[in-house]
């Protein structure tokens, strides 16, 4: 197979009125019954207790408030109840995680003082470099950066009981970005996106929404809410933007750019978003290596027959036969009956409450340890390992299918807890072995976090998360339903709990991978895009703009399964290892597909190609980790603080072409690598050799002294300012 079109760039330098102010303005208007939309402004008052806060009385008794936080950041809240809650209302009182990293009163903010000016038909409210203009008659708002209007409402804010709708004017050349993990998209102009968890993992679905968007015209909006929403960026009316959330309050942070141009605006928008919601987490270095996930505590195995045949060819030719093992069970509730070997973490059987365990043996070849050995034997770099990723799988078999042991007050008996401790010790043994091979361990957090009060729960499936971290030594977590529910406040609270437990219990930076993210998720972990079918070009195609879009939405840490969790194909698998070498997270989600999901499954040339790219990623790790630090908003001295690892072309090129869908299948990986994955069959031969067209090479220099792009593998040079075919 030909290698992907991947270039590193070599930079070639070219020859290169305030009329009056008042604390309070009051206007006469007739008393009316409360109604929607807003019908006008009665008074505007600078708060006596905080000079950066402005209180607004709209007609019909509706209250509003503007809080200036920085030169280009303010909060606009219209609350019919007049309560102005500090934080968004969670979906449950038990959800304590917040969207914001700190309250508005924090000294983190400079809090510029506000001034209020009567302009006749309108009121101008200025704080720092941002000015909010309210129309007296309609309450319609517009925002200025200096003298430049960056956005204006084309209709009054509508506070209906069923939802709150803001209608904005859309400029012809204005482009829209953000919204979280919008599968298959990074540019949302003239489209409608769902700010809700659609549980659809393919093109057009939304895996981890984020109520944050920004535009090329110089403003961004973060809706401070956990309610579902919908953002129409000109789909219904090309001159109008309509954003709505299912709640009877408008609460939003506005980010106002001081500069123009897509790349400058994008940088400001991300910095402002991080100022309010917190910097992205810097994952541990091992988190950027390949991870392996499967269940090794549930099924039965044989070398002769079984429910599912798994063949591994390693470095043999893809045309030769490989090593074969057979697995049976693979579902919740499977119980060994004494005819098959048991899979285990360590190649060892249980020692506590073993009366229900019926297995022919506990052969190490069917263990999680053996899988680590497989990666080592095939010279494949591996960073982390989850041995319980499967329904009905724990991390030990002590108390195998034993139930009961629940006291009248819901606590567990000593015998029940002893089985849990024995299983944690089993996990600890596996962690120690994995660590000796340079591999970190973690768990899929599908079940409860501590021994539950259900007497019907088999003891070997009970969890003790605190002990898993402190004794078991895990530092990686992949969240699921029990942790993040449907997302929103449930999801944010779950991932914060996971982050806090590892950081306080183990005093280590965790590697947390989650689905159903929201605004603020970036403080705690990375995004996983969901369960998808591999084995087809579509799987690679739609993920490229997905990664770009997520990175423009404030979370630079993103990953997905190698060749999907289901299905599979040798060529697609190899191509996936190629391009995802130049992405943050890579997951071998094994046990569900047509083939074993690993880089050594299909034999050469596929095994060799996958090995080459995994080793290349290892060689590039200093570069990758430096880029990850920059993405975490850490100043590395390279001038790219706050920029994501996967960078849309518009982040370095202000041209209209770079900010269009013409560049949706390429990106910059860090500062110096342009990555253009092979994502379709253009004119492939039977071995998968193909070409890649439409590669845009920007020119940051001049026509006389252009940027030179160098093919990373061949050394061939290309002039910037062309589309390469």
Place the predicted regions along the sequence by residue.
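Aromatic- and glycine-enriched glycan-recognition loops and surfaces
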Residues: 263, 304-455
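A low-complexity, Ser/Thr/Gly/Pro-enriched, surface-exposed linker/loop concept
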Residues: 36-47, 67-121, 159-165
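Carbohydrate-binding surfaces of carbohydrate-active enzymes
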Residues: 48, 56, 60, 374, ...
């Amino acid at each position: 197979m030909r290698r992907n079109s991947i270039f590193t760039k070599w930079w070639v330098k070219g020859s290169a009125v305030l009329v009056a102010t008042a604390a309070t303005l009051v206007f006469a208007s007739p008393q009316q019954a409360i109604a929607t939309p807003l019908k006008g402004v009665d008074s505007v008052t600078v708060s006596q207790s905080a000079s950066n806060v402005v209180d607004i009385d709209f007609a019909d008794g509706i209250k509003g408030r503007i809080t200036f936080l920085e030169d280009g950041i303010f909060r606009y809240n219209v609350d019919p109840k007049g309560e102005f809650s500090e934080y968004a209302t969670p979906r449950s009182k038990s959800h304590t995680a917040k969207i914001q990293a700190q309250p508005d009163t924090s000294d983190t903010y400079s809090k510029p003082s506000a001034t209020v000016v009567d302009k006749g038909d309108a009121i101008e409210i200025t704080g720092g470099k941002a000015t909010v203009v309210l129309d007296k008659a309609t309450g319609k708002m517009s925002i200025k950066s200096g003298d430049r209007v960056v956005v204006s409402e084309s209709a009054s804010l509508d506070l209906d009981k069923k939802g709150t709708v803001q209608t904005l004017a859309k400029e012809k050349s204005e482009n829209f970005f953000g919204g979280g993990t919008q599968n298959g998209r990074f540019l949302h102009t003239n489209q409608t996106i769902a700010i809700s968890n659609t549980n659809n993992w393919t093109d057009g679905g939304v895996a981890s929404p984020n109520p944050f968007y920004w535009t090329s015209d110089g403003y961004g909006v973060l809706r401070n809410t956990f309610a579902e929403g919908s953002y129409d960026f000109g789909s219904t009316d090309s001159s109008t933007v309509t954003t709505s959330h299912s709640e009877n309050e408008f609460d939003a942070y506005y980010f106002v750019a001081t500069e123009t141009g897509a790349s400058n605006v994008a940088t400001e928008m991300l910095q402002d978003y991080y100022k309010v919601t917190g910097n992205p987490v810097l994952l541990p270095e091992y988190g950027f290596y390949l991870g392996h996930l499967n269940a090794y505590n549930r099924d039965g195995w044989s070398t002769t027959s079984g429910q599912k045949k798994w063949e591994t060819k390693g470095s043999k030719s893809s045309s030769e036969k490989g090593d074969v093992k057979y697995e049976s069970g693979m579902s919740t509730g499977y119980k060994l009956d004494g005819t098959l070997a048991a899979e285990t973490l360590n190649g060892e059987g249980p020692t506590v409450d073993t009366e229900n365990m019926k297995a022919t043996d506990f052969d190490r070849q069917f263990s999680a340890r053996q899988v680590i050995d497989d990666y080592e034997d095939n010279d494949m770099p591996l960073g982390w390992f989850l041995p319980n990723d499967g329904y009905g799988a724990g991390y030990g078999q002590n108390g195998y299918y034993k139930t009961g042991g629940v006291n009248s007050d819901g606590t567990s008996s000593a015998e029940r807890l002893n089985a849990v401790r024995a299983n944690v010790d089993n996990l600890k043994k596996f962690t120690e072995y994995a660590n000796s091979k340079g591999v970190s361990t973690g768990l899929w957090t599908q079940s409860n976090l501590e021994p539950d009060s259900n007497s019907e729960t088999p003891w070997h499936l009970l969890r003790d998360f605190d002990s898993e971290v402190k004794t078991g030594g895990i530092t990686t977590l992949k969240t699921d339903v029990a942790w993040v529910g449907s997302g929103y406040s449930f999801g944010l609270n779950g991932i914060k709990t996971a982050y806090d437990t590892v950081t306080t219990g183990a005093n280590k930076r965790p590697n947390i991978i989650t689905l159903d993210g929201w605004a603020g998720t970036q403080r705690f972990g990375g995004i996983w895009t969901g369960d998808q079918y591999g084995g087809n070009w579509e799987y690679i195609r739609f993920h490229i703009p997905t990664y770009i879009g997520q990175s423009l939405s404030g979370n630079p840490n993103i990953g997905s399964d190698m060749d999907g969790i289901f299905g599979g194909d040798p060529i697609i698998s190899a191509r996936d290892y190629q391009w995802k070498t130049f992405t943050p997270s890579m997951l071998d989600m094994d046990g569900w597909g047509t083939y074993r999901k690993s880089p050594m499954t299909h034999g050469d040339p596929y095994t060799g190609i996958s090995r080459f790219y995994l080793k290349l990623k290892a060689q590039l790790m200093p570069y990758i980790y430096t880029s990850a630090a920059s993405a975490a908003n850490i100043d590395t001295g390279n001038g790219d603080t706050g920029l994501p690892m996967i960078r849309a072309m518009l982040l370095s090129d202000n041209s209209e072409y770079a900010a269009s869908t013409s560049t949706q299948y390429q990106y910059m990986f860090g500062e110096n690598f342009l990555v253009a994955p092979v994502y379709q069959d253009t004119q492939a031969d039977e071995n998968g050799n193909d070409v890649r067209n439409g590669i845009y090479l920007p020119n940051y220099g001049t026509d006389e002294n252009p940027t030179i792009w160098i093919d990373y593998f061949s050394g061939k040079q290309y002039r910037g300012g062309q589309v390469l075919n």
